[in-house]
Amino acid sequence: MSLVGAIEAGGTKFILAIANRDGTILERARLDTRHPDETLCEAATWFEGAASRHGALSAFGIASFGPIDIDPGSPTYGTFTTTPKPGWSGARFHDALARFDVPLAIDTDVNGAALGEYLAGAGQGARTIAYTTVGTGIGTGVVTDGAPVSGISHFESGHLRPARPHGDDWPGNCPYHGDCLEGLASGPAILARWGHDLSAAPEEQISLVADYLGELACALVLLHMPGRMIFGGGVMKAPGLLEALRRTTRARLGGYIAAWDRDLSEMIVAPALGDDAGITGAIALGRSCIREASVAEGP
């Protein structure tokens, strides 16, 4: 029986799971994210125990925070790069999991969530989806025909600079770009600007954040032509924000894209898998490793 080890590596917690080849989770655990020497060692030890209970692992699938090298052809594949998470720059998943001697498939946390929603959630039935999380940071994963899309690295949609209304001169709080999307519409930016989150915010604040995110939604439509866009994360739970985003996206597109010039209640949606999107995607990454190994071995 081919078993998959899966990791959803977040900035505050790690979700670990061992699953059948069909994706059924046999056991799972949660770890706090600390220094990589502690966290990765603890994760590897948990997988050793889980494997002793369920059987040997055939592959790992990992959906991780970053920035992280996700190019399988790179000598630094699976290595954290310029992450602001203290101690994590230079840490490698391969080092911690070398004892298992199995292949690893590594992608970003948002790509993992996008893949999970594509396969088993709100993205089902669409050829291309774009999944955006708006929380501590802002990031987007795109999946086409069942595979995450990337270039030399993962997308950084949160660092696009939106057009801003006249008189909106708050400088933003991104340490790199100031008033990029992440510096204006992430959870920390909203708190820094107004001193509260959007859970009970006045309509004008909801509308302004929707305007910022509408810039991103329009860019995703124009660049990727998704059949569906999913917006998740803590900020998107604010009452009325998703509806405002639909309105501003349609208005900003100006009728130019026929498929998006209509009511967008089925085109811009909330996630369906909740907190399980990331681990579902990580399992799928691991399953792809097993399939590729089977093809390479031949009949």
Regions found by a protein language model. Give the residues of each.
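ATP-binding/phosphotransfer module of carbohydrate and carboxylate kinases, centering on a glycine-rich
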Residues: 1-59, 68-76, 94, 98-103, ...
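Conserved G/P- and acidic residue-centered "switch" motifs that form tight phosphate/ATP-binding loops
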Residues: 8, 109, 135
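Conserved A3 ("GATE") glycine/threonine-rich loop of ANL adenylate-forming enzymes
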Residues: 13, 112, 136-138
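Conserved NAD(P)H cofactor-binding loop of Rossmann-fold oxidoreductase domains
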Residues: 65
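A charged helix-plus-loop insertion that forms the helical arch/lid used to bind
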Residues: 74-89
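General beta-strand structural signal in soluble alpha/beta enzymes
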Residues: 104-112
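Glycine-rich phosphate-binding loop of actin/hexokinase-like ATP-binding domains
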Residues: 126-182
